[in-house]
């Protein structure tokens, strides 16, 4: 279980991507292009927080490997049509496994 964000947090997660986490657990990824891949030893910068909802911006093309690994509080993910690649284990060990938006024709659902 991660920490709850007591204040808003933000940073970078790709060459042209930024992330922003609200204190109520909504993570928004914005910008254009590819997200970095992460690993067991180099977790995503939001990995220590309880992410409840994830909104991925319309110009993002790749969800990085292990980007949301072990996000056990995650209940909703929005994947836009611009996403053409989802990295290995991107949503591995997430409790949530049933609510992915249908805005993306390639990934109308994700095997989590």
What are these regions (language model features)?
Residues 12-14, 20, 34-49, 55-56, ...:
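A composition-driven surface/loop motif
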Residues 4-9:
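Boundary at the C-terminal end of the N-terminal hydrophobic targeting segment
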Residues 26-32, 49-62, 72-85, 94-112:
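Structural signature of tandem-repeat unit edges
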């Amino acid at each position: 279980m991660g920490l709850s964000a007591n204040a808003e947090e933000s940073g970078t997660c790709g060459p042209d991507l930024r992330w922003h986490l609200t204190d109520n657990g909504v993570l928004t990824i914005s910008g254009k292009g590819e997200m970095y891949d992460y690993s067991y030893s180099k977790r995503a910068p939001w990995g220590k927080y309880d992410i409840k909802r994830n909104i991925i911006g319309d110009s993002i093309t790749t969800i990085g490997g292990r980007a949301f690994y072990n996000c056990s509080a995650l209940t909703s993910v929005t994947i836009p049509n611009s996403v053409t690649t989802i990295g290995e284990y991107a949503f591995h060990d997430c409790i949530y496994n049933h609510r992915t938006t249908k805005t993306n024709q390639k990934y109308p659902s994700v095997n989590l």
